[in-house]
């Protein structure tokens, strides 16, 4: 409500349910402190930034002590810095209040930073669900369809394997060197990236393995319980026809 102050905006749900002025004042001031807007109590929405407006909306949603806080594309219109600050706030609220937070988003960085569990919806139905770590490690088809396959120039010979594993210390980063040493085989790394998941990091790499060593490599990965999948090579002509 553009004409009302931040205080009045947050107080509205409690006013509708006929809470006393004392109860409203106590609750609103507690929430203003929680979302970091105590100094904006008397400001009007037109004088707030996008991130501050989201903080007001979060505070207002918490006035009635809900069991679940639904955030529907809460960061979609915000810049990366503000997005991070809002996610930090939501994580802080989750820890302090113990409230369940459901985040609806198309931004995968939001899922990786703030969520413990995730489900992927396709045509109104749950296609896959699980912990965020498991979903991004296993890379189910629903996730790949959502993200769009990253184009990598893949060799047409041998086997192109995408490998995903957690990289939280120097030992984890030695996977490929140790695998090459253990198997006596040097393989090219075609692509690689590190993604952050709250306080953890996951590496996603693509390697090329010849036919002779394919079985040994995959057995090695399975024994180490490292997730892998073989990438399909699609000719550019076939892509154009599709």
Language model regions located:
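Helix N-cap at the start of a conserved alpha-helix in ABC-type nucleotide-binding domains
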Residues: 80-82
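Conserved signature/switch motifs of ABC ATPase nucleotide-binding domains
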Residues: 43-46, 64
């Amino acid at each position: 409500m553009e004409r009302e102050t931040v205080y009045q905006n947050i107080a509205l749900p409690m006013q509708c349910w006929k809470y006393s002025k004392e109860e409203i004042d106590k609750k609103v001031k507690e929430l203003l402190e929680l979302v970091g807007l105590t100094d904006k109590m008397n400001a009007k929405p037109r004088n707030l930034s996008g991130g501050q407006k989201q903080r007001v909306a979060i505070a207002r949603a918490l006035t009635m002590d809900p069991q679940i806080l639904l955030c529907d594309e809460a960061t979609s219109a915000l810049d990366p810095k503000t997005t991070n600050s809002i996610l930090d706030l939501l994580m802080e609220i989750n820890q302090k209040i113990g409230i369940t937070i459901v985040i609806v988003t198309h931004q995968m960085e939001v899922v990786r930073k703030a969520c413990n569990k995730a489900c992927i919806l396709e045509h109104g139905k749950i296609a896959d669900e699980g912990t965020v770590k498991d979903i991004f490690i296993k890379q189910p088809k629903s996730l790949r369809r959502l993200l769009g396959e990253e184009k990598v120039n893949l060799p047409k010979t041998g086997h192109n394997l995408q490998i995903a594993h957690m990289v939280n210390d120097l030992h984890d980063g030695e996977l490929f060197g140790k695998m090459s040493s253990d198997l006596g085989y040097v393989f090219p790394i075609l692509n690689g990236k590190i993604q952050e998941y709250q306080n953890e990091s996951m590496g996603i790499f693509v390697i090329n393995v010849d036919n002779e060593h394919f079985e040994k490599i995959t057995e090695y990965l399975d024994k180490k319980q490292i997730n892998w999948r073989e990438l399909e090579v699609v000719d550019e002509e076939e892509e154009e026809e599709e």
